[in-house]
């Protein structure tokens, strides 16, 4: 590979990374603004806002951006958008269920972008309720291992309402009912255990195993959906084995 083409490739990769980082920052800022609007601008009395701010800080969002978003949401500063949360349902290739959560100030634009991403990548939209029943809303706390064992984490969160602790390789995932999320996060803090994020999420109650080709198609569809600024979260019930993930990483 020549020096020029190598530089062009590196430059392209950096542009992709920067674009994704910009989208991630925008989503984190939206989270803060919406949380402040719904529950008030004081993070001490608004756990959802507290968690949104913590997640933004851990993702290196500048403090000034965080504070301006909080103020816009709380009505202390003009300029906040009228964000709406809209959930769409559909299917990826191989019958994999997909839940798409949009946070948008333009419902028609969001619907159009979701539909285009789905149809161009082998997916199909589904009627409301036809996919959602395959998922349960849960509180999810993720934390780096940092020398901790699964038993260490379980001992800290069991009495706070945690349902299970999952080993994700480099990190742990604590699952609880959404109403117990603050208690679980607080229990970790009281035990001196730092966490990466604490938020409500959808966990599949029924999983759909996919092979390497199926996983490629599902991830391609998810990437296309997440390219939309209006798409906030995408959940699927695809069950991707460690072997398939390793094969994808090697491509």
UniProtKB/Swiss-Prot annotation:
Official protein name in the record: Probable transcriptional regulatory protein ML0475
Pfam families reported in the protein's UniProt record: TACO1_YebC_N, Transcrip_reg
UniProt feature coiled coil, ranges: none
A GO term for molecular function: DNA binding
Subcellular location: Cytoplasm
Superkingdom of origin organism: Bacteria
InterPro entries on file: Integrase-like_N, TACO1_YebC-like_2nd/3rd_dom, TACO1_YebC_N, Transcrip_reg_TACO1-like, Transcrip_reg_TACO1-like_dom3, YebC-like
GO CC aspect terms: cytosol
Keyword vocabulary terms for this entry: Cytoplasm, DNA-binding, Transcription, Transcription regulation
Matches recorded under SUPFAM superfamilies: YebC-like
Species for this entry: Mycobacterium leprae (strain TN)
Keyword Transmembrane helix included in the entry's annotation: no
Single Gene Ontology BP annotation: regulation of DNA-templated transcription
Keyword Transcription: yes
Similarity field: Belongs to the TACO1 family.
């Amino acid at each position: 590979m020549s020096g020029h083409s190598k530089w062009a490739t590196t430059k392209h990769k950096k542009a992709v990374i920067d674009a994704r980082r910009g989208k991630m920052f925008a989503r984190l800022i939206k989270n803060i603004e919406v949380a402040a609007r719904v529950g008030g601008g004081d993070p001490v009395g608004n756990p959802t806002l507290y968690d949104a701010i913590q997640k933004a800080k851990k993702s290196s969002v500048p403090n000034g951006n965080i504070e301006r978003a909080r103020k816009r949401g709380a009505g202390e500063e003009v300029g906040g958008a009228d964000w709406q949360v809209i959930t769409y349902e559909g299917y990826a290739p191989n019958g994999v269920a997909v839940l798409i959560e949009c946070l948008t100030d333009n419902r028609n634009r969001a619907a159009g972008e979701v539909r285009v991403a789905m149809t161009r990548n082998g997916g199909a939209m589904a009627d409301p309720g036809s996919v959602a029943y395959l998922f349960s809303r849960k509180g999810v706390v993720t934390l780096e291992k940092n020398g901790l064992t699964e038993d260490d984490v379980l001992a800290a969160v069991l009495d706070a309402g945690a349902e299970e602790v999952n080993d994700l390789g480099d990190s742990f995932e604590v699952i609880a009912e959404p109403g117990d999320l603050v208690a679980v996060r607080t229990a970790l803090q009281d035990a001196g255990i730092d966490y990466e994020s604490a938020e409500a999420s959808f966990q599949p109650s029924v999983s759909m195993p996919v092979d390497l080709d199926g996983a490629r198609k599902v991830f391609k569809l998810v990437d296309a959906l997440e390219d939309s600024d209006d798409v906030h979260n995408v959940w699927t019930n695809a069950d991707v084995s460690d072997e398939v993930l390793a094969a994808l990483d090697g491509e």
